[in-house]
Amino acid sequence: MIALDTNALVRMLIEDDESQAKRVQQVVVSAEKNSVQIIILPEVLIETVWVLESVYRCTRKDISQFLENLISTETFTFPDSTVIRNAVNHYKKRGDFADLLIVAQARKHKAIKFFSFDKNLQKIFPDYVVEKLNQADL
């Protein structure tokens, strides 16, 4: 197994540095030929989404499509693809990808509530993200 960093993932998608994009593509092709998995860590996905939004001004639709394609490719593996899919599904509609991934992780770990002052998250998950806890929640 090998891991890809954010800059490699971005080069693969954006192809703004032809030499680096080709090198990443060679790694992917070699991994496929040799049945080697390429792991993409959640932190790399968070950083990748941030770079695509902030630096390259990619649309939410394009980023969502990229993430879905990445998750569907057999060569790539993720520590918890179900959690990542959940975050991507919410990200398609609205929200910050990092926050959505954090909430998905909290749910995976069976947190009964998610305490946050983030109003946008509260709107997306009104019964789960709260800024006040009741005694029954503890």
Region roles according to the model:
Residues 1-40, 55-61, 133-138:
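Short, well-structured N-terminal submotif of metal-dependent ribonuclease cores
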Residues 11-13, 51, 124:
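Residues that scaffold the ATP/ADP-binding catalytic core of kinase and kinase-like folds
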